[in-house]
């Protein structure tokens, strides 16, 4: 679910660490015991979902690319190709995915059409692994230096099985609760908006904001 009326929804689970991954946003945020939201890390260029879609487009995979990359990745070996996982040091709190797309293009330029077709599942598996490894690596670093009661995964890319499994492993490792929407609901924005209303039946959790297509999460929470 998208964050709304945090103190009610996350009762007993604060402080909370959230990973939001979609085609337009990639960020880590925390919700304090007082219910205050703070962005800890965000992408400096492409969002993770955007990187998956752009990679799919380079490979000639039909839109929506991300789910198709995941489907092909399940048939491939994620260790076949070594794509860069980040340009930033592991402890630097930012994401970057633009270099990953460039690396894929250079890799493709060195392959024949026949090689590309034969290696497509392995390319998708390796490319997806690079995206997910960066997401989980940054999340793991924050869990190592901060203390949380719960971790959450949201956004359209939270439907990705490998990412969901990775977040669940982190929750188990750090002995905290894992919170994420059921996979079938991860792409339904209407359901997320309805849940926000359900979590705040009195309508007190409001904010005066203008329409902004790329509004930051911490600008309205």
Where are these regions (language model features)?
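Short beta-strand scaffold segments in enzyme catalytic cores
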Residues: 18-20, 26-30
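Glycine-rich phosphate-binding loop plus the immediately following alpha-helix
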Residues: 32-77, 101-102, 106-111
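Conserved phosphate-binding/catalytic loops in two-lobed NTP-binding clefts
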Residues: 150-151, 168-192
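Glycine-rich phosphate-binding/hydrolytic loop that grips phosphoryl groups
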Residues: 1-3, 181-219
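Glycine-rich beta-strand-to-loop/alpha-helix junction loops that act as flexible
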Residues: 22-24, 151-160
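A contiguous, well-structured pocket-lining segment that forms one wall/lid of small-molecule binding clefts
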Residues: 71-151, 160-174, 201-204, 218-221
